[in-house]
Amino acid sequence: MKFLFSVILVIISFLGISKIVNGQIACPSPFLYRATNDTVGDYDLGYQYINIGKPLPPQLSFLNNCLMPCQSSFFEQDSWNSFNKLVKQMGAVAFTCSAIIMIIYGPLMNRSFFKFDRHTITVFCFALSTFFIGVSDLMFATNDVDMVCPESHRYARQTDKTCATNGVLFQFGWLGSVMWFAFLSIDGFFRASGKKMNKIAFAIVLASIWILNIVLSFAPMGGDQYGAYFVGQVNCWILVKNWQYAFFWAELIVSLAIGFVGICLTIYSLIRKTSDGNTLKHVTPLILVFLLFCQYLYMIIFYGIINEKKDHYQNILAEQVGCIFNNALAKMKVPGIVYAGECTFNETITFSSQYAFLFFVRLLGIEIFAFYLFSKETLLLIKSSYIATMFGLGDKDAYDVELEETD
């Protein structure tokens, strides 16, 4: 962690920096001292202490009251700038891509939408979900870091401006994409095998997914769970890992299981129909579902590691800062302080793993666009759309005829 080397330079430049600066207790830059006896209450307000995690000599006891900066010291500022830039730029692209697919597959252009066409509605719902992720990213782009860091050393909480809204939008979009990915895999199997689904059954599935998504997105507000996490996310999201497991990761695990079954059944159906001239057109959606499966799998592995090792990562950072200051005070011959030897710098979260996580979440909206925009199905939807037929450029039955022939 290169950040810690900058701490060393600060210490050296100030000859070990005293804990008293102009009569005020000071912490090493970029940390900030906060006098408190209620660290738990402060956490609820958004303050994150470095938490040395072990008894300290009196001369160093002030370090337990040092606040972590927002955004956190797990990454250098250049790294955070890269993360923020990725979310802003890629989020805007994903928002636009999702909106285009929503328009084509939604009721504005899709004549089959209100006929409860299973496939087009499923694609629309997935695009709608990634659209909400894009909206949350645009909120971050508009408000910048102030949305997650209302103060230099305080992380946003649900009571802060825009954080609750951003958290709900992100959760709603991300969770929705997960559940509709699962159904997209089942839809692929139905299309590849030629099986049909009762429209009433599909209506029940449609309503159930959206109702469940709404409940799981708004319920965390009852526990004041939305806020800025000091690692993993750039947006506001669910703070406590047990709440994350209950309201997101459990649903993702179930969706991955369904997705895996759907992928296997689709492959099996395609193998059985290798002589069918329509087999190739089912391969592209299968590739999309497989890529989504891999991305969601990476997300759960990454966040699982983060959640399980969060306290460990904090302790590494805290111990390294404590070691540096201990040695600095020892060199100043402060009574009672013993030189602790060379301070080691252990890796916590790599830049590439964090970047990949943020990238994969934003890639969802771009993928649905890339895989469906130029498909034959999309071209038929455009040809049969209200707008195309209004100007005499299309055939209102084009998509339905294709559907009858192949589905």
Swiss-Prot record:
PANTHER family: FRIZZLED_SMOOTHENED-LIKE SANS CRD PROTEIN J (PTHR31787:SF11), G-PROTEIN-COUPLED RECEPTOR GPCR FAMILY PROTEIN (PTHR31787). Its main location: membrane. Belongs to the G-protein coupled receptor Fz/Smo family. It is a multi-pass membrane protein. It comes from Dictyostelium discoideum (Social amoeba). The chain crosses the membrane at residues 90-110, 121-141, 170-190, 200-220, 247-267, 286-306, 355-375. Residues 24-89, 142-169, 221-246, 307-354 are extracellular. One of its GO terms (cellular component) is membrane. It is found in: Membrane. Residues 111-120, 191-199, 268-285, 376-407 are cytoplasmic. Keywords: Coiled coil, Glycoprotein, Membrane, Receptor, Signal, Transmembrane, Transmembrane helix. InterPro entries: GPCR_Fz/Smo-like (IPR050949). This is Frizzled/smoothened-like sans CRD protein J. Residues 1-23 form the signal peptide. Glycans are attached at N37, N346.
